[in-house]
């Protein structure tokens, strides 16, 4: 576990990997579960905020992969599960160009690394959560997008989901657990979308 203010620092990420090795002797699974969104399209979003989105959402994944891949290769394999977002696949209700671009980048980074390391026994996949009901939705997003009206935000989000309800963190976790497990031994370079059908919907 690397705290949110350190995930963009190479030395801190390497120290995390080294600490895991010291404690457990090997690393079989890496889950990159980092994310934060900033509102705004290309005009509204500042260059500083754009850079922050790329660093926090994408560079963090790059650094963790960079430092763990040699360890996994040395030990004969492993599984990497990266977390992206449906914002990297489609419009999800608000302009957040930095977040969307960085999460799309996570998916493509995963595909490239998956192909490069497939013959070394290392699998790399992405879980793509949709609009879930998490504490962050009520604590932060409602203030950003619905003037603090939690019920209004939830109603808007549910309306986009064909399943008619929002999942939660357990749904994301179950997908990640599958991809990290031996049951997914022939699965690499792909995504599991956990969104109640939202991405498949065309309107």
PLM ranges: what are they?
Residues 85:
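Residue(s) in the substrate-gating loop at a strand-loop-helix junction
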Residues 65, 102, 110:
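Active-site helix of classical SDR
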Residues 41-54, 157:
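Substrate-binding pocket helix/loop in short-chain dehydrogenase/reductase
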Residues 70, 115-116, 185:
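Alpha-helical segment proximal to the catalytic Tyr-Lys
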Residues 1-3:
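Short, small-residue-biased leader/transition segments that mark boundaries at the very start
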Residues 118, 123, 187-189:
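Short, small/polar-rich loop/turn modules that mediate ligand/substrate recognition or access, typified
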Residues 90, 176-177, 188-203:
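Short C-terminal tail/terminal secondary-structure segment
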């Amino acid at each position: 576990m690397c705290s949110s203010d350190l995930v963009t620092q190479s030395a801190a990420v390497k120290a995390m990997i080294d600490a895991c090795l010291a404690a457990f002797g090997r690393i079989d699974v890496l889950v990159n579960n980092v994310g934060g969104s900033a509102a705004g399209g290309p005009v509204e979003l500042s260059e500083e905020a754009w850079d922050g989105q790329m660093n926090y959402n994408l560079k963090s994944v790059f650094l963790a992969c960079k430092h763990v891949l040699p360890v996994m290769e040395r030990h004969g394999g492993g599984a990497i599960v990266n977390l992206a977002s449906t914002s990297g696949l489609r419009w999800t209700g608000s302009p957040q160009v930095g977040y969307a671009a960085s999460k799309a980048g996570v998916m493509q980074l995963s595909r490239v690394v998956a192909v490069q390391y497939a013959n070394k026994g290392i699998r790399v996949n992405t879980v793509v959560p949709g609009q879930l009901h998490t504490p962050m939705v009520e604590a932060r997003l409602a203030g950003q997008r619905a003037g603090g009206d939690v019920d209004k935000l939830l109603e808007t989000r549910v309306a986009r989901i064909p399943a008619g309800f929002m999942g939660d963190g357990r749904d994301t976790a179950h997908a990640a657990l599958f991809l990290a497990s031996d049951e997914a031994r022939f699965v690499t370079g792909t995504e599991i979308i956990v969104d109640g059908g939202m991405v498949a919907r065309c309107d």
